């Protein structure tokens, strides 16, 4: 094995990322060295690349970015037993402390001291990445690497959608970014009676339709509340999966929900949000759920079962672009345009 590798690095505060030749990571006794075969771009990566206020307050350069990964194990620490050389793996990117009360209660996704791969530690937009053994997930080898790499964000969709019963329910998904779009086939496979997808981006709406959405709603052209009620016998949606973080979409989702509906909130608003809690939530008996990350490891087992039941094949259209590390600027520009599904970086792909 060579001693160096190519990696996309955030070298200093400010926009952009630099492709550098750096040493291949060394691993400790409980670490795993993974040769990265595919790494999909997440909204978090875009925030770090563009260097928004959140990134400026959280990320400490220099740092190799990227966290949604799939690859092959090429070396393991002497105490590692969870995987072996040659295994195909992905990673749970939340590195938890195992010491706080939430970890002690088995709520690892709510760890008080979480560190994130590619945000707080060197990440996966590189030819190799070192991952703690406790974060390794061994994949079925018949799943393409690009679909293995999107399991982490898919876990967010699964956690949000399956945090309550969907059987025979009407479901409204507000926000058709990749996670919102992933929620469409998840809800369908979970037995939803009808799945309605809402976004102002026509490209993303059509992609949601390709993945199985029954109704596509563009709130700039239609009244979403009226549309939802027209498909739900005038009552409103049984379940709202809020994936956008957009204040207007959140309010529309609440108004489009039936009395007593479940509202699962994953999208992060960029500013404080004003709601009429009395009229829109309390008096209507809505059940609001804040969703963060994936349950460790319950959600990963759910994803595996769904993949084996056919979800992997259904998600193929979501991966719209495959690009080499050298094209990170073009990849981020494309992501910012909103005219893509999931963009996957492939280190072995030639520019």
UniProtKB/Swiss-Prot annotation:
Name of the featured protein: L-threonine 3-dehydrogenase
Binding-site residues for Zn(2+) 2, renumbered to this chain: 97, 100, 103, 111
Pathways involved: Amino-acid degradation; L-threonine degradation via oxydo-reductase pathway; glycine from L-threonine: step 1/2
InterPro entries according to UniProt: ADH-like_C, ADH-like_N, ADH_Zn_CS, GroES-like_sf, L-Threonine_3-DHase, NAD(P)-bd_dom_sf, PKS_ER, Zn_alcohol_dh
Positions contributing to Zn(2+) 1 binding: 42, 67-68
Record's keyword terms, sorted: Cytoplasm, Metal-binding, NAD, Oxidoreductase, Zinc
UniProt-listed PROSITE patterns: ADH_ZINC
GO molecular function list: L-threonine 3-dehydrogenase activity; zinc ion binding
Listed EC numbers: 1.1.1.103
Subunit annotation: Homotetramer.
Enzyme class of the recorded protein, top EC level: oxidoreductase
Cofactor(s) it depends on: Zn(2+)
Active-site residues (renumbered): 44 (charge relay system), 47 (charge relay system)
Free-text cofactor note: Binds 2 Zn(2+) ions per subunit.
Family affiliation: Belongs to the zinc-containing alcohol dehydrogenase family.
Taxonomic source organism: Symbiobacterium thermophilum (strain DSM 24528 / JCM 14929 / IAM 14863 / T)
SUPFAM superfamilies, alphabetized: GroES-like, NAD(P)-binding Rossmann-fold domains
């Amino acid at each position: 094995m060579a001693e160096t590798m190519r990696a996309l690095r955030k070298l200093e505060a400010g926009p952009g990322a630099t492709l550098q030749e750096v040493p291949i990571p060394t691993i400790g006794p409980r670490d795993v060295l993974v040769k990265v075969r595919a790494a999909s771009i997440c909204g978090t990566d875009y925030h770090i690349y563009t260097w928004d206020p959140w990134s400026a307050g959280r990320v400490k350069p220099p740092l190799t970015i990227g966290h949604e990964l799939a690859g092959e194990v090429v070396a393991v620490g002497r105490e590692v037993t969870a995987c072996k050389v040659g295994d195909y793996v992905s990673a749970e990117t939340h590195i938890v402390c195992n010491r706080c009360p939430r970890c002690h209660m088995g709520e690892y996704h709510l760890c008080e001291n979480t560190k994130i791969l590619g945000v707080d530690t060197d990440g996966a937009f590189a030819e190799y990445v070192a991952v703690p053994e406790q974060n390794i997930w061994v994949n079925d080898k018949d799943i393409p690497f690009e679909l293995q790499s999107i399991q982490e964000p898919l876990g967010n969709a699964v956690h949000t959608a399956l945090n309550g019963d969907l059987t025979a329910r009407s479901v409204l998904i507000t926000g058709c970014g990749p996670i919102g779009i992933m929620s469409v086939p998840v809800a369908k496979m979970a037995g939803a009676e009808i799945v309605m997808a809402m976004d102002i981006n026509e490209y993303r709406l059509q992609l949601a339709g390709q993945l199985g959405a029954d109704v596509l709603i563009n709130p700039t052209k239609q009244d979403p509340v009226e549309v939802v009620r027209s498909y739900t016998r005038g009552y409103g949606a049984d379940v709202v999966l809020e994936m956008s973080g957009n204040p207007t979409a959140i309010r529309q989702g609440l108004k489009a929900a039936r009395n007593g509906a479940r509202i699962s909130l994953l999208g992060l608003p960029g500013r404080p949000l004003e709601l009429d809690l009395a009229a829109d939530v309390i008096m209507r008996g809505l059940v609001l759920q804040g969703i963060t990350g994936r349950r460790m490891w319950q959600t990963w087992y759910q994803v595996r079962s769904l993949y084996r039941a056919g979800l992997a094949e259904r998600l193929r259209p979501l991966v719209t672009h495959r690009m080499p590390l050298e094209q990170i600027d073009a990849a981020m520009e494309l992501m910012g345009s909103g005219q893509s599904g999931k963009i996957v970086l492939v280190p072995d792909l030639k520019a």
